[in-house]
């Protein structure tokens, strides 16, 4: 493949949910390509069948589509260097490993599991790091051919140099060197003929012309082995960008196994996709220059301004409160129509009686931070909850249960007037305000009891006249009359 444009790849394994760290890798990989009009490739790495989860490939597709991280080449749309599913590429890996064997850069290893287990047990007993001892590294060619002909099981191992150092340059962590003597002769082809993850990665990245590899910093220690493979084949080494881990706190990495939220979990809780993506981008990356103080970025903004020099070396702590604040800001920026469309499923899950959703949303939007918290605010619409008349006492509004009864009785004829249009919130408010003026009272003296009578709660999405207009005349009158009876009781 020509390397005159940036080509990046997101290469997830279909093992379940898309956790936050994976989605961040996908986002950075996408931005690295798109910032310079490059090519973003999706490759599915499904060779580890033991970890394969049915339906997980669809999760990958759906998440990337929902977040707008659309790929230019991939399993479903094809491209010039397919197939883009690793299990469909199995035939090619062994020939590359055998090429290295022929050139003396790899070798057949016939050591059994039992021998390796005994070797590692002995090394541990002596306080050593477990490693392969090179038993088969220099077997005579005739012996190797004889054992292969006899059908003896084998793996193919990379012949790591015993002396010198291997260095590489990372765009985040700088230049890193490792003594070759500290590296193991890693397995390239397993006994079942399948490639190891590292080997398949290098071969696929080369054949697909990948110019920039973006991955977690946990792969830093493997990178010298990757480089030795590139050098063994005489291939161009890609640019490396290793990202710091996303942490739950100072000690623990964010992990689905520990019950931490995946992308799907956050959406299910009512976080907006755009807000999630915005926040995830800021986990370990900071904008520069004129954007240094800005926090809200659309995907188009990020494509324009994102560069890898903003990535930090330090672990990023996932802060739920920060995500919540960013989500709230995205909710504020929605048009009333957009908010209604996003909030409606949550409203419908909680309210099954006819209400004025447009007015409800006008009251919800300024207060809402997470859509999933809407239903708990609406539990009084379908049925009036039990409440104590002491709720009517409010020092600020100068109300008591006794004054509340007086206020509701004064409101009853106002709200019963057939000429009053409950679809006109301002008209209902003005009628109530006029009654308060007639009585020589402040608005709150009249309207605070109305809110309690309609909801049985002190905190509601809207004041008394808002609730009346949301519910309509019939429900409003029923509840006001019931409240007067309760106060008479």
Residue ranges and their predicted role:
Residues 34-46, 199-212, 233-247, 461-466, ...:
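Glycine-rich phosphate/pyrophosphate-binding loops
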């Amino acid at each position: 493949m020509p390397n005159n444009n940036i080509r990046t790849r997101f290469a997830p394994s279909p093992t379940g949910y898309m956790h936050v760290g994976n989605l961040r890798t996908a986002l950075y990989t996408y931005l690295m390509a798109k910032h310079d009009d490059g090519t973003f490739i999706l490759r599915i790495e499904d060779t580890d069948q033991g970890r394969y989860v049915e339906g997980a490939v669809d999760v990958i597709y759906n998440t990337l589509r929902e977040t707008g991280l659309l790929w230019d080449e991939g399993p479903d749309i094809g491209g010039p260097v397919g197939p883009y599913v690793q299990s469909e590429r199995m035939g090619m890996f062994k020939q590359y490993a055998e090429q290295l064997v022929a050139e003396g850069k790899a070798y057949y290893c016939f050591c059994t599991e039992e021998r390796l287990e005994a070797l590692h047990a002995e090394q541990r007993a002596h306080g050593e790091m477990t490693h392969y001892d090179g038993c088969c590294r220099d077997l005579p060619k005739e012996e190797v051919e004889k054992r292969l002909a006899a059908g003896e099981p084998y793996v193919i191992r990379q012949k790591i140099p015993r002396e010198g150092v291997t260095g590489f340059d990372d765009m985040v962590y700088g230049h890193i060197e490792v003594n070759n003597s500290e590296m193991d002769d890693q397995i390239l082809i397993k006994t079942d003929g399948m490639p190891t993850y590292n080997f398949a990665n290098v071969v696929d990245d080369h054949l697909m012309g990948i110019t920039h590899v973006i991955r977690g910093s946990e792969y830093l220690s493997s990178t010298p082995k990757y480089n030795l493979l590139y050098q063994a084949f005489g291939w161009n080494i890609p640019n490396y960008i290793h990202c710091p881990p996303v942490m739950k706190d100072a000690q623990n990495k964010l992990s689905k196994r520990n019950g931490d939220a995946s992308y799907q979990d956050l959406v299910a809780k009512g976080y907006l996709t755009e807000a999630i993506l915005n926040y995830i981008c800021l986990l370990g990356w900071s904008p520069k220059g004129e954007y240094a103080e800005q926090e809200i970025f659309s995907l188009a903004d990020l494509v324009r301004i994102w560069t890898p020099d903003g990535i930090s070396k330090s672990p990023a702590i996932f802060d739920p409160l920060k995500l919540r604040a960013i989500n709230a800001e995205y909710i504020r920026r929605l048009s009333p129509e957009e908010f209604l469309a996003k909030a409606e499923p949550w409203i419908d899950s909680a309210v099954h009686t006819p209400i004025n959703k447009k007015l409800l949303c006008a009251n919800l939007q300024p207060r809402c931070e997470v859509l999933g918290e809407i239903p708990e605010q609406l539990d009084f619409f379908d049925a009036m909850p039990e409440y104590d008349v002491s709720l009517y006492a409010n020092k600020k509004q100068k109300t008591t249960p006794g004054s509340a009864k007086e206020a509701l009785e004064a409101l009853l004829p106002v709200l019963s007037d057939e000429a009053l249009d409950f679809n006109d919130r301002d008209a209902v408010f003005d009628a109530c305000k006029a009654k308060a003026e007639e009585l020589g009272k402040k608005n709150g003296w009249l309207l605070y009891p109305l809110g309690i009578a309609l909801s049985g709660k002190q905190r509601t999405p809207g004041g008394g006249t808002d609730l009346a207009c949301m519910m309509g005349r019939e429900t409003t009158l029923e509840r006001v009359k019931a409240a007067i009876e309760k106060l008479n009781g």
